[in-house]
């Protein structure tokens, strides 16, 4: 019997949105940008989903945590 060959799909390489915008610093007061990296339950979206590089993902994480501490963003949404 001939074995069937599985067709492999090439994954689309996600590019860091912040690298393309040439962002050097993610500010905790920029809520419009930070909300793009939060789920509807206010959880931080992982970098494998967003396609961010490690450097910018760390900056986003720190900025979101600072904004939460300053009560600019909620910790959870119900």
Swiss-Prot record:
On whether Repeat is a keyword of this UniProt record, the answer is no
GO BP terms, alphabetized: translation
Q: Which Pfam families match?
A: Ribosomal_S18 (PF01084)
Q: Does the keyword Ribosomal protein apply?
A: yes
Q: Which UniProt keywords apply?
A: Ribonucleoprotein, Ribosomal protein, RNA-binding, rRNA-binding
What do the Gene Ontology cellular component annotations say? cytosolic small ribosomal subunit
* Gene Ontology MF terms in the entry: small ribosomal subunit rRNA binding; structural constituent of ribosome
Quaternary structure note: Part of the 30S ribosomal subunit. Forms a tight heterodimer with protein bS6.
> So what does this one do?
Binds as a heterodimer with protein bS6 to the central domain of the 16S rRNA, where it helps stabilize the platform of the 30S subunit.
Which family does the record claim for this protein?
Belongs to the bacterial ribosomal protein bS18 family.
Q: Which protein, by its recorded name, is this?
A: Small ribosomal subunit protein bS18
Underlying gene: rpsR
